[in-house]
A protein has these predicted regions:
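Soluble FAD-dependent oxygen oxidases
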Residues: 1-328
Length: 328
């Protein structure tokens, strides 16, 4: 573990750990400034996914402590998977760090996953390489197909039954070859402060989230023929729709979402959308300002010959814009 000191301001603790399963050789995702013990190999795949569920359960503790958690599963073929977890804790007392993370590793040990010697160290906050992103992702996210969902606090109620269902969905998704990433953080209205949750445009679902779950197709898709892309998108969309069914009142983080997100007004903006649409119409009655799936964009679309989603092409009027759904 690293506790990164920001003199006179905050300390940021960072803990990284790995566990793997499967018969294949393992390539560990690269870390940035986070020392860790050697990865623990888990012989039984079911135990690997139980350990994943243990991390998901603990993620709320990270959020409640004001921290930020990464918990990513990367398939590496032939039934081989790597999990990497990282916890960062701003403004957390250095002498309390071990007390905080010990329950996580105790719970893992109880199911037979013993992480050797989790420990922490101190590094200057500004030291080169001390980023908080623990994993590099080859290539650009721009050429990857990915879809996301915000996982709300309610999933951690009722003894975690619904959270177990989320873990099962993510397992099935990873077993199809998708990379499943989670980002645990809590941008609640209380944490954010002014302007709060009434006049801001932030999706209300983000104020109630514990995890932002993003699922990637690992191979680039920007070179795929349109029909193949459509099939790949439908396949991944079907997986994420399982999470949507488990979180019907939640939504999606606009900046890391499906370019073809269905019901995007509600997914991206939630109950704020009617108010935001009124503002857009007041300040831009000419519809001069436009971007894909942003507030008030229903009346226009970029049309490409191959039918693929793009923002490079002619901007055309939508013949039958579904405006009535959100009219004040």
């Amino acid at each position: 573990m690293i506790v990164k000191a920001w003199p006179g301001k905050i300390n940021i603790g960072g803990l990284t750990f790995y566990f793997t399963t499967g018969p294949g050789p393992v390539t560990l995702p690269s870390a940035r400034g986070y020392p860790s013990a050697l990865p623990v190999h888990i012989a039984d795949a079911d135990t690997f996914w139980k350990a994943y569920g243990v991390y998901l359960t603990f993620a709320k503790e990270i959020v409640d402590a004001g921290g930020f958690g990464f918990g990513d599963v990367t398939p590496q073929g032939n039934g081989t998977y790597v999990f990497v977890g990282t916890i960062t804790l701003p403004s957390f007392p250095a002498d309390k760090m071990k007390d905080f993370y010990t329950p996580l590793f105790r719970s893992l040990s109880e199911i037979g996953v013993d992480i050797p010697n989790p420990r922490h160290a101190f590094l200057p906050y500004a030291q080169g390489g001390n980023g908080v992103t623990p994993i590099s992702f080859p290539g650009s996210a721009a050429d990857r197909l990915f879809i996301s969902r915000l996982l709300p606090c309610a999933l951690w109620d009722n003894n975690g039954t619904r959270l177990d269902a989320v873990a099962a969905v993510n397992r099935a998704t990873a077993e199809l070859g998708y990379r499943v990433t989670t980002r645990a953080y809590g941008p609640s209205a209380a944490v954010a402060g002014y302007p709060g949750n009434t006049t801001a445009a932030v999706n209300p679902a983000m104020r109630d989230m514990v995890i932002h779950c993003v699922t990637f197709k690992q191979e680039p898709v920007d070179v795929l023929p349109p029909a193949v892309f459509a099939a790949e998108h439908a396949r991944l969309r079907a997986r994420i729709d399982e999470l949507v069914r488990l979180t019907p009142d939640s939504g999606t983080y606009f900046n890391e979402a499906d370019a073809l997100e269905p019901d995007w007004q509600r997914s991206f903006w939630g109950a704020h959308y009617p108010r935001l649409l009124r503002i857009k119409r007041e300040v831009d009655p000419w519809e001069l300002f436009w971007a894909h799936k942003t507030v008030g964009s229903e009346g226009w679309e970029v049309v490409a010959a191959d039918g693929l989603p793009t923002q490079n092409g002619p901007l055309c009027r939508v013949e039958r814009a579904v405006r009535f759904l959100w009219s004040p």
